[in-house]
A protein has these predicted regions:
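A short, flexible beta-alpha/helix-coil linker loop
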Residues: 40-42, 173
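Catalytic micro-motifs at enzyme active sites that drive phosphoryl/nucleotidyl and oxygen chemistry
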Residues: 11, 21, 46-49, 59-61
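Extracytoplasmic loops and strand-loop junctions of Gram-negative outer membrane beta-barrel proteins
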Residues: 4-8, 42-44, 103-107, 134-135
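Signature for the C-terminal beta-barrel architecture of outer-membrane proteins
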Residues: 51-190
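"Short basic amphipathic alpha-helical interaction patches in structured regions
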Residues: 38, 47-52
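Beta-barrel outer-membrane channel/assembly domains of diderm bacteria
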Residues: 1-40, 64-66
Length: 190
């Protein structure tokens, strides 16, 4: 499942297990550049942190909040480290490649479920005191899919400490190469 500690060739869990990653961070005005080990939390890619060692990615991420009420993100991820591994590897679609559920070690154009180029970009606009924010996000998993996500979030303040939040999203994912990934999804949350 990619969630548990790895086992060695004897079926035993290693006696030590750890991971270390560094990130360069620079800030100019309301713009932030991060390069190195990243744990993104954006609509098109989200690092899993529900286990002892979190999933991490290696890449570059630029976040800009230079324009009032507008947040922009752009970046490229090239490698990933699963929660049950201490090794960087090509980014895998769902942690496994193909329908067989077997990990593949080589990244090739004929294996569209692995990539070293995951590009993302997105903007989110907060419409002032209206409680409404809208966003658009794009991702390109090189050789597998392109994804567009449009969302709207409305927050209704009930009192100073409570609010009701509605989130509506539409995602369209289209096949790139022969990945077999092609879908549309609508989701909502209250």
């Amino acid at each position: 499942t990619g969630l548990l500690l790895p086992k060695n060739h004897k079926g035993k869990v290693p006696s030590s297990y750890g991971s270390l990653g560094g990130t360069f961070k620079a800030r100019l005005s309301e713009n932030t550049l991060k390069a190195g080990t990243l744990m993104p939390k954006i609509p098109t890619v989200s690092s899993g942190d529900g286990r002892l060692i979190p999933q991490t990615f290696t890449g570059v991420h630029i976040n800009s909040q230079e324009i009032e009420n507008l947040t922009a993100n752009i970046g490229r991820l090239g490698r990933m480290k699963q929660r049950n591994s201490t090794n960087d590897a090509p980014i895998l679609l769902n942690g496994f490649s193909g329908n067989q559920g077997k990990r593949k070690n080589k990244s090739t154009r004929s294996n569209p479920t692995e990539t070293s180029k995951f590009d993302f970009a997105g903007v989110n606009y907060n419409w002032g005191d209206t409680g409404l924010s809208t966003g658009y996000n794009f991702a390109n998993f090189d050789g597998a899919y392109k994804q567009h996500i449009v969302n709207g979030v409305y927050t209704l303040a009930i009192d100073d400490s409570q609010s009701l939040k509605a989130d509506l999203r539409y995602a369209k994912t289209s096949e790139d190469a022969k990945s077999g990934i092609d879908n549309k999804a609508i989701s909502s949350m209250l």
